[in-house]
Amino acid sequence: EDVLQYQSSVEKACKDAGISQFSTVMLAMMQQESSGLGTDVLQCSECPFNTNYDNTPNAITDPYYSIQVGAEYFAYCLKEAGCRSIKNTERLKIALQDYNFGNSYATWVLENYGTYTVENATEFSLMMQNTLGWSSYGDPEYVDHVLRYYIAS
């Protein structure tokens, strides 16, 4: 499988970012984001932790840099969601959706609902679409799309 070629790199990046226990989740995220294909394997070109490439879709041309940035950004999302353990699945879901939306979902959902649901993720997506004038905003079902690939270790 294309994602598994990056397993050791994901494990190292997660260790460096202080989120070693989440490396298998990151592999599932990579499967959802790119199936391990292309160069921006974690689709994080637009992420604020990307300082080496343009902040436009698929601008990252080094898969290992994409993994590094993705791990740093996911560590930030986990912190925003208050998720300190892989076993805290409710907070993990918030962190995953925050990674996909890229901005402020964790804070918003914790203030308004306290937990992730597809319904409140859809509400947030529509709110951001309207605010930004975009035709779509993220994937409100990202959590389920990632977790179908996740195998707890």
Each predicted region: which residue ranges?
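N-terminal carbohydrate-binding/catalytic regions of secreted carbohydrate-active enzymes
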Residues: 4-20, 24-25, 29
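Short, functionally critical alpha-helical segments immediately adjacent to catalytic or ligand/cofactor-binding
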Residues: 20-37, 44, 67-71, 95-101, ...
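Non-catalytic cell-wall polysaccharide-engagement segments
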Residues: 1-3, 9, 51-68, 72, ...
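Generic recognition of cysteine residues
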Residues: 14, 44-47, 77, 83
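Glycine- and aromatic-rich loop/turn segments at beta-sheet edges
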Residues: 38-47, 117-118
